[in-house]
Amino acid sequence: MKFFFNILSICAISSSFGAFKAVGNELDEVICNAMKGMQAKEEKKIPYNIGDYELIGITVDCKKKALITEKKHIQYSLSDFSEDYKINAIKNWEKANCKNMIFNTNTGWSTTQIIQDTDKNVVLKLKANFETCSQ
């Protein structure tokens, strides 16, 4: 999870420097380039453990303005995840990502994390973007 916060920090810094000069598509290009650079760096390490999870995928889709990460729990099956887990995960995801200017301003960019169980069944799909962050 720490790597993801580093990703968002890099993107925030890159876009804040570029925001003074960039307008519209230029800002998208700055964000895209920052995320693509981070993706290339992180892909070299995949898969790797993050606490109880293994990071198994990271994708940046500049046309859709989306950052997607996938992680798999190293012990839990689908039935092992409680409702409290899902509620807390959603709150934590939004709280962490809505602090980032890429997702809390109307840039059109979103971040999604797909959480899977040990058998790669989807447990939860978390998303943060301007719409969720402005509620």
Regions found by a protein language model. Name each.
Residues 1-20:
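Classical Sec-dependent N-terminal signal peptides that target proteins to the secretory pathway
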Residues 15, 41-45, 97-101:
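Solvent-exposed amphipathic alpha-helical surface segments
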Residues 17-31:
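Cleaved targeting-peptide boundary
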Residues 20, 82-88, 116-123:
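Short, intrinsically disordered, charge-biased short linear motifs at domain edges
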Residues 28, 37-66, 72-76, 104-135:
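Polar/charged, Gly/Pro-rich intrinsically disordered segments
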Residues 29, 33-36, 91:
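Polar/charged alpha-helical tracts
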Residues 81-105:
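Short, non-transmembrane amphipathic alpha-helical segments
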